[in-house]
Amino acid sequence: MKVFCGRANPTTGSLEWLEEDEHYDYHQEIARSSYADMLHDKDRNIKYYQGIRAAVSRVKDRGQKALVLDIGTGTGLLSMMAVTAGADFCYAIEVFKPMAEAAVKIVERNGFSDKIKVINKHSTEVTVGPDGDLPCRANILITELFDTELIGEGALPSYEHAHKHLVQEDCEAVPHRATVYAQLVESRRMWSWNKLFPVRVRTSLGEQVIVPPSELERCPGAPSVCDIQLNQVSPADFTVLSDVLPMFSVDFSKQVSSSAACHSRQFVPLASGQAQVVLSWWDIEMDPEGKIKCTMAPFWAQTDPQELQWRDHWMQCVYFLPQEEPVVQGSPRCLVAHHDDYCVWYSLQRTSPDENDSAYQVRPVCDCQAHLLWNRPRFGEINDQDRTDHYAQALRTVLLPGSVCLCVSDGSLLSMLAHHLGAEQVFTVESSVASYRLMKRIFKVNHLEDKISVINKRPELLTAADLEGKKVSLLLGEPFFTTSLLPWHNLYFWYVRTSVDQHLAPGAVVMPQAASLHAVIVEFRDLWRIRSPCGDCEGFDVHIMDDMIKHSLDFRESREAEPHPLWEYPCRSLSKPQEILTFDFQQPIPQQPMQSKGTMELTRPGKSHGAVLWMEYQLTPDSTISTGLINPAEDKGDCCWNPHCKQAVYFLSTTLDLRVPLNGPRSVSYVVEFHPLTGDITMEFRLADTLS
């Protein structure tokens, strides 16, 4: 059965109705899931297996039958571990129907159908009794309900319900306990992801400073956690202000509460500085004695950094304090972790708070609109003074006396740069009400509300009256649009340039004047694992899961790239970067598709995991901004990526085939095509068999 789905096209800006298979969402969720990453997490799998064996043994030693409840079973892996360890029966709960169906097949293939019952329900809907899903309460509770924040996937309510209704009072739990850790730091880099810094512009009249409105400075920021691969943040980017502090623990073998709570830890600052950011992670102990431990600690907090396990399904958290506060070395302070049923947040206090008073402190929520419009990488991009200087220098070369500028980018400061650098009149278009209001406030606090005209409408709908009857001599864009997911989605600027053609003066300048799509073939240190088949996991056959992921990838995404912030995922270039397509913004969009075919020679040995693609914008003939590679690769090929942008990764089909040898074909062929009508860029990269 086919269904019609309405989707906003991020490149053309139009609303499209697409005919999709009724199971499209299922396939998309499977294709973009972390199931493969979890199966490749050997440390996790081994520790769970050890903990399960120990729990089953403790129950058997008491002379009891081992009845297991496995919540969030996924592939059924942990249930199969339990049965192999000697459990008498296992009830495996999985709410996602396609996953539950796969678990049934995997359990059957491994010969455990007589000992494992897969139940396709949310655990809070599971019943116990003669006519229930379980005949009696279980005495072993196994779960994998955790996300990077520990409780963000609803672990606390699920545990709370399970203890009340599904498991015995003295049950064994795997994991047995979780502990959340925090470390207070000062970090201009990370703080720049949360606050708008003053922006400096050198002009003929001296330095001008663009300042943020007071409501932006007071705003506590976005409520969602910032989860990143903290091991990729250089220690030079932050100053440690506290030891690693154990903030709170949850004992999963006892009744768990999902009620709001707070936990305070007094500490003595290791250094004086501005307390801005809390780095946080957790570990889980699989047994009551804490001998079997799985930790998410970054390398500097590991007892043995050499044994660091890479994983993408669990990372580390960055929390921003509502406001930065000075701390003095040796002067005690109190860090407080607050949580409700799904979220964690932090505050810094002078004394230990009364538990009851702070338990219900309201979770920080953005009230300035900026954190709803700009994500954290975008804040970092706007705060990048070198980037601002680059745009300012380019503007100086194209601005002329009497220039009438039209700026088209979401929530951009370009219009203010243009004004300060001498434009006679500046218009800026903000499509959303939120960005319109935000920019009005920023202009007002900088006394520019009468200098820059803000137009709240889609740029395609601009009229001569909106521009006060004037013709535009300089069309500006970064370009940046909040709807863009992949690098080339910002080609929406080209569509806007085409639609406003009648408002441009003869000889009008467009900045950027052109864009180009670039690619390089890479070998990832670890990211390949999220798309690599597992086959066998701790002795269990999970090929069915591999096939399921491959089918979902083939369903829609086999020829699509996916966005990843590659500064978090180290890789080596195996080829030289190559320009694939160019787009001339000085001209309207052509009617016919643009295609590029070619071959990329592999100049370094390694496993070709995929092609990385990014956009470069030629602001002027002598000035270019890259959203991808920002430095030439070093001798070994190590890549340095723009930290404010996501790059596009096209995983080669060989990433899904472990049989391809390391030193296989020495070139990659490609076909890339831009379709002006839809704004789509279709592509195919494949290893060329140069050996035959």
Curated annotation (Swiss-Prot):
One Pfam family recorded for the sequence: PrmA
Enzyme class: transferase
Enzyme Commission number: 2.1.1.321
GO molecular function, one term: S-adenosylmethionine-dependent methyltransferase activity
Source species, domain of life: Eukaryota
Self-association state and partner proteins as the record states: Homodimer and heterodimer. Interacts with PRMT5 and SNRPD3. Interacts with CTCFL.
Active site: E144, E153
Gene: Prmt7
Summary of the knockout phenotype: Mutants, shortly after birth, display significant reduced body size, reduced weight and shortened fifth metatarsals. They are subviable with about 45% of the expected number of mutant pups at P14. Surviving adult mice exhibit increased fat mass, reduced length and limb abnormalities. They also have reduced bone mineral content and density. Knockout mice show sexually dimorphic phenotypes, including changes in bone mineral content, bone mineral density and fifth metacarpal length that are only significant in females.
Job of this protein: Arginine methyltransferase that can both catalyze the formation of omega-N monomethylarginine (MMA) and symmetrical dimethylarginine (sDMA), with a preference for the formation of MMA. Specifically mediates the symmetrical dimethylation of arginine residues in the small nuclear ribonucleoproteins Sm D1 (SNRPD1) and Sm D3 (SNRPD3); such methylation being required for the assembly and biogenesis of snRNP core particles. Specifically mediates the symmetric dimethylation of histone H4 'Arg-3' to form H4R3me2s.
Protein name stated in the entry: Protein arginine N-methyltransferase 7
Main subcellular location: cytoplasm
Modified residues (Omega-N-methylarginine): R32
Domain named SAM-dependent MTase PRMT-type: residues: 14-345, 358-684
Cellular-component GO terms for this entry: cytosol; fibrillar center; nucleoplasm; nucleus
InterPro entries, alphabetized: Arg_MeTrfase (IPR025799), MeTrfase_PRMT7 (IPR014644), PRMT_dom (IPR055135), SAM-dependent_MTases_sf (IPR029063)
